């Protein structure tokens, strides 16, 4: 009997070992770990890891922070649909969380968050404005993202990682799509790139923004909680600044990955 290759094989219930680990202070992981309110976590990225995929990328936010892996397949020809299908390609996104990705019991999706289908649609809406789908008529591009470890701001990390993987696959794009998250602290302070503890301790206000940095255009915006005019404008500004800070890191990673693909010229022995 053929197996389900799309299903994440793992136990129905799982708990991360970090659930039982205490910090040096004897409690949970220590807050911002020295970061300022508007300072994002340092990011490590690498492209071209998976040989089986057309394009791939890995992103890690902070030491022991959120870890995301992405693979891109296609473009592949698909069946005739309608006028839109004939002139424009389609981007399909699958965003899932590994059973061991978070502390606490495994619930089958992101705890207290969207279902895998909803998360995939949110990822798709953030990426579509960056991809030149008109260049791939009657074709589809499949983006598969797995959150290996969720320590906060998983969706923005997935957007950045998927965008890097699309570029690594050679998919024509208008610009990279970069994501950044923000939450409102218990005292009303805006915290850029929050970790999981800060997200849980927040006062009901979170925001996830996707930006095309070169074009300076917002490709996706998701918020929860009540936001007043001035605070929402400040939150959007901080998220855009966070995306702009991330752009040089991904750009440099993409250049290195492209250079690795260029064959080394052999000396002429004649």
UniProtKB/Swiss-Prot annotation:
Cysteines engaged in disulfide bonds, as pairs: none
Location of the region described as Disordered in the Swiss-Prot/TrEMBL record: 23-42
GO annotation, cellular component aspect: cytoplasm; exosome (RNase complex); nucleolus
GO biological process, one term: rRNA processing
InterPro entries: ExoRNase_PH_dom1, ExoRNase_PH_dom2_sf, PNPase/RNase_PH_dom_sf, Ribosomal_Su5_D2-typ_SF, RNase_PH
Keyword rRNA processing: yes
A GO term for molecular function: RNA binding
Compartment(s) of residence: Cytoplasm; Nucleus, Nucleolus; Nucleus
Chief location category: cytoplasm
Keyword vocabulary terms for this entry: Cytoplasm, Exosome, Nucleus, RNA-binding, rRNA processing
Keyword Cytoplasm recorded: yes
Pfam families referenced in this protein's UniProt entry, alphabetically: RNase_PH
Residue ranges of coiled coil: none
Role description: Non-catalytic component of the RNA exosome complex which has 3'->5' exoribonuclease activity and participates in a multitude of cellular RNA processing and degradation events.
Subunit structure: Component of the RNA exosome complex.
Family: Belongs to the RNase PH family.
Name under which the protein is recorded: Exosome complex component MTR3
Lineage summary: Eukaryota, Metazoa, Chordata, Craniata, Vertebrata
Name of the gene this protein is made from: exosc6
């Amino acid at each position: 009997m053929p197996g389900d290759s799309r299903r994440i094989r793992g136990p129905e219930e799982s708990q991360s070992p970090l659930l039982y680990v205490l910090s040096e202070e004897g409690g949970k992981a220590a807050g911002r770990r020295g970061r300022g309110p508007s300072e994002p976590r340092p990011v490590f990225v690498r492209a071209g890891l998976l040989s089986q995929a057309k394009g791939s990328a890995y992103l890690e936010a902070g030491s022991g922070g959120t870890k995301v892996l992405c693979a891109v397949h296609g473009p592949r020809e698909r069946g005739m649909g309608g006028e839109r299908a004939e002139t424009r390609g389609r981007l399909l996104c699958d965003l899932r969380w590994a059973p061991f990705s978070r502390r606490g019991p495994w619930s089958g999706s992101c705890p207290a968050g969207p279902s895998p289908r909803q998360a995939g649609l949110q990822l798709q809406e953030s990426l579509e404005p960056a991809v030149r789908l008109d260049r791939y008529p009657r074709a589809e591009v499949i983006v598969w993202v797995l959150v290996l470890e969720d320590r906060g701001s998983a969706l923005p990390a997935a957007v950045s990682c998927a965008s890097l993987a699309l570029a690594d696959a050679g998919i024509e794009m208008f610009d990279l799509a970069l994501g950044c998250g923000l939450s409102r602290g218990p005292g009303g302070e805006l915290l850029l790139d929050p970790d999981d503890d800060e997200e849980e301790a927040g006062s009901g206000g979170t925001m996830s923004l996707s930006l095309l940095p070169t074009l300076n255009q917002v490709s996706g915006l998701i918020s929860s909680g009540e936001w007043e005019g001035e605070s929402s404008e400040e939150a959007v500004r901080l998220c855009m600044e966070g995306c702009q800070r991330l752009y040089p890191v991904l750009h440099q990673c993409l250049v290195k990955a492209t250079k690795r693909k260029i064959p080394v010229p052999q000396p002429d022995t004649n």
